[in-house]
Amino acid sequence: MDELTDVYNELIMEHSMNSYNKKKLENADYCEVGHNPNCGDEITLQLKLNGNKIEDMAFSGHGCAISQASTSIMIDTLKGKTVEEAKEIIKTFIEMIKRETTDEEELKKLEDAIAFKNVSNMPARVKCALLAWHTIEDMLNKNDSTGTGNINCCH
């Protein structure tokens, strides 16, 4: 198990240092700002849809290694998924962090985001890990409730 924890730690560090998905998206359909007042983490998520599929995502902002890595890995996990699939993955991630689900079969859909499983043991870091996930959840829920297709557009 220690070996797996090491792999997860390496993945988190790699994403926090390299921020593969930290960029500006041209022609984003949606944009949402997330802020964690407890530690000052702040992100802006951008989303590009192709029909009902997440074509691309990106983020900008600043924060601790956990929030930055969680955002980057979330983007990798959700790209290419339908909005419905993304909502299911988001729900599972939040439940994992809050210790509401431990079903290994259910957690498999998280792909690399499962690396944050042990964050639930660090109460001060839970909000950091969840920031991007709550932000994208808010963005997708706003889109559903209004149906305008142009919520908080970044253009």
Predicted regions and their residues:
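Domain-level signature for proteins that mediate thiol-based redox and metal-cofactor handling
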Residues: 1-155
